[in-house]
């Protein structure tokens, strides 16, 4: 390379490094409520976190971050400031919607992370195209969906529904039914006092109950480990196409083989129905 060309290339690289710094701005709002909140949250990119705080108010903190496209930095900063000055927060009674930016162009090359503190009695609906979702300590119900990213829900007093196209799902300490689906990722649903319906195309499944209730588990590629409620009775149906089955002492009422088991645990009870295509089944 000629000296002049080398100088020009080095100068451009230096400008690129300096100019590619991210722009970050925030918006905040506190909404006072007389009663539980119903939240409807969405973000294209950035993720969502909801935690329980004291009653009577919802505290919203949004973080707007630019991408690293040098040639669009001025335009991106202008759009970030538009969102910052008019944050996407709507209220109708105790229903609060956050993240619904009606002019979709404003979010191009911008991520928006939502961090929200709510009264413990709240229910939550959350949607993310790219980014994880975490909900902790609310009454519920909780309904989460993400196209790319994991989902975590803990200490929920009622139903949890979690769906991820790509990402793991971790649910713990739920006092109600749990419904979980992921195309690619593992599933943990532990300490559940309600029914469980879990399915993954690629990944393992771990389930445990504190109260006997129906369990349905499906995994195309990955094993399943289930811990049943202590001293409770269940009806059991388990099958693996490639793997082995380990079950507690039970009364056989149908097939019993290394890859298929059907019978009653203790005196019988809610149905445990487990099928995996490739992997082991371990029921405790």
Task: Tell me the role of every PLM-derived stretch.
Residues 5-16:
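Bacterial N-terminal signal peptides
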Residues 133, 205-207, 224-227, 283:
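Beta-strand-rich extracellular passenger or scaffold domains
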Residues 7, 223-224:
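General secondary-structure propensity
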Residues 18-42, 47-128, 134-146, 152-164, ...:
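Acidic (Asp/Glu) and glycine-rich low-complexity loops/linkers
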Residues 175-222:
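Eukaryotic tandem repeat interaction scaffolds
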